[in-house]
Swiss-Prot record:
The keyword Disulfide bond applies. The lineage of its organism: Eukaryota, Metazoa, Chordata, Craniata, Vertebrata. One of its GO terms (cellular component) is extracellular region. This is C-type natriuretic peptide. GO terms for biological process: blood vessel diameter maintenance; cGMP biosynthetic process; growth plate cartilage chondrocyte differentiation; growth plate cartilage chondrocyte proliferation; receptor guanylyl cyclase signaling pathway. It comes from the Eukaryota. Belongs to the natriuretic peptide family.
Length: 22
């Protein structure tokens, strides 16, 4: 949940959906 991306892809080790921290 720490890795953020504008593409809404799973980047962190937990597999949390990123895309909110742009």
């Amino acid at each position: 949940g720490l890795s953020r991306s504008c593409f809404g892809v799973k980047l962190d080790r937990i597999g949390s959906m990123s895309g909110l921290g742009c």
